Amino acid sequence: MSAAALEEIGIAPLQENTSLRPPPLPATCVDVSSDDYIKLTTLERQLAHLQVMEDYIKLETRNLEKELLHAQEEVKRIQSVPLVIGQFLEAVDQNHAIVGSTTGSNYYVRVLSILDRELLKPGCSVALHKYSNALVDVLPPEADSSIQMLRPDEKPDISYGDIGGLDMQKQEVREAVELPLTHGELYQQIGIDPPRGVLMYGPPGCGKTMLAKAVAANTAASFIRVVGSEFVQKYLGEGPRMVRDVFRLAKENSPSIIFIDEIDAIATKRFDAQTGADREVQRILLELLNQMDGFDQSTNVKVIMATNRQDTLDPALLRPGRLDRKIEFPLPDRRQKRLVFSTVCSRMNLSDDVDLEDWVARPDKISGADINSICQEAGMQAVRENRYVVLTKDLEKAYKNVVKKDTNDFEFYK
């Protein structure tokens, strides 16, 4: 009932005891639930755990860095020279391989775990531990090769103008070697393949090697010079491997020119060989034939060969497709003699009474090297007599010494 109704019937209403009320909360107090408190304590425990984990990881990292440094020092000690050079033959599994040593034996060896397996290709050069023969390193392709390219500062300082005569030979060499490297689109427009190889043959001293030097000096292509006898090695298989190295190096640095001097050392006609040395030389020739057939025309690799004995070369090497152009270097005729004499003597201080036509008209068969030797000897005669001018008598004496000197007559000691 309400307070007014109670008063009407004479009953006083109950008074509210304000002392029993709780005091009001201050405005600055926040009611924190128990869920938030639990979350806070959980996060604090997780933070403490993460800090412990961080300290543990830092300590473990320091230990691993020490182990890595120790392992690197151990690898350096293992890979320290001297090491044995071998050849990778076949991978057995991830940790073992078969390698060949320079002694001709094959070994089943362990492979260092840190080596990049992508570099281990059949035929690549590897380094073997001296005692265990374990494969500890992969060598660069040219590390054990004796075949080197001529650096720009090593190229001979010879131009075509320094070679007297040989106009036709110069033109043929430039058409077969230089033109395909500099203007290969001409052959594509005509629809023909450029020559792959050139054979220069003729008597000694007729300018074959000198013309090859001029080609090396006047082209921007990489130039690789080898002598045929370099391919003949002591151990079986070394010669064919060197042939492969030459053509591999030429392909990697194309456009390039390979000049093989004295090719008759390895390219004589094949026969029924009775000795191991003869069979090895024939294997070198077979590898050379295979490489000349195998390299792609687009690699811009040209081959120049020189020999004094073209009649002894194997017919398989001379066929078109391998050596497309054969250039003869004969003994100089009268016109060529005049050009050679003029070229060589252009750098000499000759007397006004010297008439080179006198020596040009002589019928003796002499080569360009003989003419150069005559002029050099004439200069030495002038030096001997303390003169700065070469006289006619100097050239005459030099001509007799070089051309008409009897091998059993040593006039120097008379």
UniProtKB/Swiss-Prot annotation:
Q: Name one GO biological process term.
A: proteasome-mediated ubiquitin-dependent protein catabolic process
**Localization per Swiss-Prot or TrEMBL:** Cytoplasm; Nucleus
Q: Which GO terms describe its cellular component?
A: cytoplasm; nucleus; proteasome regulatory particle, base subcomplex
Q: Which UniProt keywords apply?
A: ATP-binding, Cytoplasm, Nucleotide-binding, Nucleus, Proteasome
Q: SUPFAM superfamilies under this entry?
A: P-loop containing nucleoside triphosphate hydrolases
Query: InterPro entries per the record?
Result: 26S_Proteasome_ATPase, AAA+_ATPase, AAA_lid_3, ATPase_AAA_core, ATPase_AAA_CS, NA-bd_OB-fold, P-loop_NTPase, Prot_ATP_ID_OB_2nd
Q: Could you name the domain of life of the organism this protein comes from?
A: Eukaryota
Q: Which residues bind ATP?
A: G202, P203, P204, G205, C206, G207, K208, T209
Q: GO terms for molecular function, please? A: ATP binding; ATP hydrolysis activity; proteasome-activating activity
Q: Chief localization class?
A: cytoplasm
Annotated PANTHER family: 26S PROTEASOME REGULATORY SUBUNIT
Q: Would you identify the family this protein belongs to, as annotated? A: Belongs to the AAA ATPase family.
As for what it does, the entry says:
The 26S proteasome is involved in the ATP-dependent degradation of ubiquitinated proteins. The regulatory (or ATPase) complex confers ATP dependency and substrate specificity to the 26S complex.
Q: What is this protein called?
A: Probable 26S proteasome regulatory subunit 6B
